[in-house]
């Protein structure tokens, strides 16, 4: 069974709650990374960085990040070596994020899409699997570049 990490900033708490319920109804285990340990409102860099590291460290197989647009969360998650995050606002992009890019993290914007479309997008992403094939060398090249950056 997939273990899903979810995280949201203050702009997307309602959507996060809706998505969490949706995932739990599908029988998935969901861990929430939305809360700031200081008791302050969560800010997207902290949420995305913590969640991305939880994926990298093997605590969860997939991660869902939610903020106003999905942009900031996606940028931060992609700063963590080994993480491939994709901002998606349609089902086709979500499927391709998994099938072609092996994205372990998806980022969505609560101010861009509504809850029903968000559920469809996440469902499409969860149902898709990495195809390998011609995409495998491209994903490997991403890892190569990450390694180069780390050692410069």
From Swiss-Prot:
Keyword set includes Isomerase: yes
Classification via Pfam families: LacAB_rpiB
InterPro entries found in the cross-reference section: RpiB, RpiB_LacA_LacB, RpiB_LacA_LacB_sf, SPI_LacAB/RpiB
Single GO term (MF): intramolecular oxidoreductase activity, interconverting aldoses and ketoses
UniProt keywords, alphabetically: Carbohydrate metabolism, Isomerase
Listed GO biological process terms: carbohydrate metabolic process
Catalytic residues, chain numbering: 67 (proton acceptor)
Superkingdom of source: Bacteria
Pathway as given in its UniProt record: Carbohydrate metabolism
Catalytic activity: D-erythrulose 4-phosphate = D-erythrose 4-phosphate
Protein EC: 5.3.1.34
Function summary: Involved in catabolism of D-apiose. Catalyzes the isomerization of D-erythrulose 4-phosphate to D-erythrose 4-phosphate.
Similarity comment: Belongs to the LacAB/RpiB family.
Name of the protein in question: D-erythrulose-4-phosphate isomerase
Species annotation: Pectobacterium atrosepticum (strain SCRI 1043 / ATCC BAA-672)
Taxonomic lineage: Bacteria, Pseudomonadati, Pseudomonadota, Gammaproteobacteria, Enterobacterales
